[in-house]
Every structure is written in C-alpha cells, then in structure tokens.
Amino acid sequence: MGKMKFVICMVLFLNNCATLKIKLNPINQSNAESDDGSDEQVEKIWLEYFDILNNGELKDVLSFMKPSVIFTFNNQTIKTEDHDQLFLLLKQWKENQKKKDIYIKNHSISSGKVADDFITIVDVIQGEYSNKTNELIKEKRTFYYFHRLKIKGWKLYMITSAALENEL
C-alpha cells in the first residue's frame, strides 16, 4: 500500500511539473526549437510509437517502452513487470479498440522537460472516432512519460490519463 501511495504521489508531482513547464515553455509552438532539440526528438519518438501501435506489429511497440510501465487511467493503476505482461496489455487494448469499432486521431501534441535531458512528458489530446461514421465519439488527454537511458535512449515508462480543461 505504501508503494502505491508513493507511485500516486510521484505521478501527481510529475504531472504538475509537466503541466507548468508545458504552459510556460515557448517550445510549444510547433516550429520552435528547444535548446538541444530533445523535446522535438521525444515528440517524434512518440509519433513513431503511436503509428506502430495503430498500424504495425505490437511486438515492435515494445522497443519504445521499458519492461515495467505504469498505466493510470480513471483512478486505476496497472504496473507491468516485464515485456510479456506489457505485450498482453497492449494486445487487450488493441482488441478493445476493434470491439468498439473506433480509430484514434491526434488533435494536439506538446511536450515539456521535467528534468533536462532526463525526463520529458508528451501531452497528447486525441479523439476517438467511429469507423462507420467518422464522427468524434469523445476527446481524451493523455500524458506519456519518457525517461532517457544512457545506452537505449528515450523509453516510455508511464502513461496517465488527464482531464481535459473543459472537464475541470
């Protein structure tokens, strides 16, 4: 229970840091450059991850992620222990998307460094659309937390849902 409280506190802390940095950081304009390009680099990594997640092989998505990833959606936290468990979770997500007969479209992407060249958060607003009618079903906001590893580069280690500003 103590470990869960720590994880929740860290999620809230990092989320607040990222929100503040994203709002204050001038790099949020799409054509602006950051000091070393790491935010744009991480956004490109996220776009590649998202494309493979939706159109490619799920096993290829694992290369973008640490084996232990924390997912927090609707006040429920799931932590994977290894790539096998992570693969099963992603497979379940993809099957659920097929069952709902929806596709996901990106509405906006921005990023902010939480710790210079060490942790970056990508803030994504997406829409879920009906495959039959192409109508927007709902809009959602998700934070993707990336950690830079010395040898392996940027890896996704946490994904959390967030309320949209009009939902607050």
Task: Map each language-model feature to its residues.
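Hydrophobic h-region of N-terminal signal peptides that target proteins for export
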Residues: 11-17
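Short, low-complexity N-terminal intrinsically disordered segments enriched in polar/charged residues
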Residues: 18-59, 63
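Surface-exposed, charged secondary-structure patches
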Residues: 87-133
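An amphipathic alpha-helix signature
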Residues: 58-62, 67, 83, 87
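Short, solvent-exposed secondary-structure junction/capping segments
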Residues: 47-51, 63-78
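Sec-dependent signal peptide recognition
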Residues: 2-9
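A mature extracytoplasmic/lumenal domain signature
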Residues: 65, 75-77, 123-126, 160
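Short beta-strand edge/turn micro-motifs at domain boundaries
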Residues: 20-26, 138-168
